[in-house]
Amino acid sequence: MKKKILIGIITLLIIIIAVAIGLYVGNSTVRLWTDKYILKKDIGEEDLPTIEIEEKDNIQAYAYSNYLATVGNNTLTIYNSSAKVVTSINVSITKPQFESAGRYLLVADQGGENLYLIYNDSLQWQKQMEGNISHICANDSGAVGVIITGTTYKSVIIMYDITGKEEFKTYLSTTIATDVAISNDSKYLSFVEIKTSGTVIESKVKTISVEKAKTTPRESIIYTYTTNSNSLILKIKYKKQKVVTYCDDGIHIFENGNDEKILTIDNKISFADITLDGYICSIAESEGNSILNSEYELKIQNVENKKESTYIIGSTVKNLYCNNGIIAVSLGNEVEFVNTNGWLAKKFTSIQNIKDITIGEKVAGIIYKNRIEVLTL
């Protein structure tokens, strides 16, 4: 008898849990109520640890992994998720440029010569380049790519390994490189090449075999991609062996010499991004909107299987920020942090205007003129 009662109770609990999950997943009203009152996803500025900054110091901030880094007055300061200083590193940087991958943070003096690679909160190596740094990239293995200008060549592309040892250099005499990315396994480096000498600007993505670049440099470029529509290529990012490519007319996947367009960017799309790990996202006004009721759809697409998730936004979007597996949708004084499943992770509300947002894997920085608030994701 007791066994039957126990089985009945367990069965009832399973049914209740299944119904609750079904309502949460399938009913947006239930999900919003649960997020706010049960899961406590709504956060206010008074709830967050704060880093005080001086507006006159022109402090620049960047979140990576579970840290937040600031650069100002030739000092790189790294904070933890509680806004406590972990370490400070002397640097020579006027205009910081940041890139990150996993636990690695790459910081360069944009237009200058100095480059620094950080792992967690420790300086791995630093270099003074011969030329001006225009673009940088890193991968999860600590490999680094740099585009240099201001030499006898229009662009020089350099790759370094995790120790800072140079892997190879590629020189461009008549064209310029505008972006660079390294595959997860460090076997390939791709770059965007722009030709401006003709009547029409031409853009291509070229993929270099790192092994061939070290042994037979003349044979190192194994793929050259141009879009079918000859659109302008703006940005690239690797997902395994796929080169995810942001163009002015859409987002393409380049792989093994093939071009697949997975998103068309038209006047209906107000924002799009490829910075997420393995996903792309876009924001467009929902169909059937009226003057009194405006909704926007955030669509998140997996670049491997093309599966798509949708998150509904209830007001006008001011800006979009993406990194790792988190999307931040800025609505002015409110920010909705959404994961790649299309679910709300956190909702932040401020009484002041937000200047900027930076997102790491586990933390985000809400940037104001005089302070940075650190939000744990």
Could you tell me what each predicted segment is?
Residues 87-192, 199:
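Non-cytosolic head/periplasmic domains of membrane-anchored proteins
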Residues 68, 105, 143-145, 186-189, ...:
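Hydrophobic beta-strand positions that form the internal "hydrophobic ladder"
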Residues 1-50, 55-56, 377:
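Sequence/structural signature of beta-propeller modules
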Residues 254-349:
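Intrinsically disordered, low-complexity segments enriched in Gly and acidic/Ser/Thr residues
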Residues 178-291, 297-299:
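Acidic, serine/threonine- and glycine-rich low-complexity intrinsically disordered segments
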Residues 53-62, 91-103, 131-140, 174-184, ...:
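Repeated scaffold domains used in trafficking and secretory/extracellular systems
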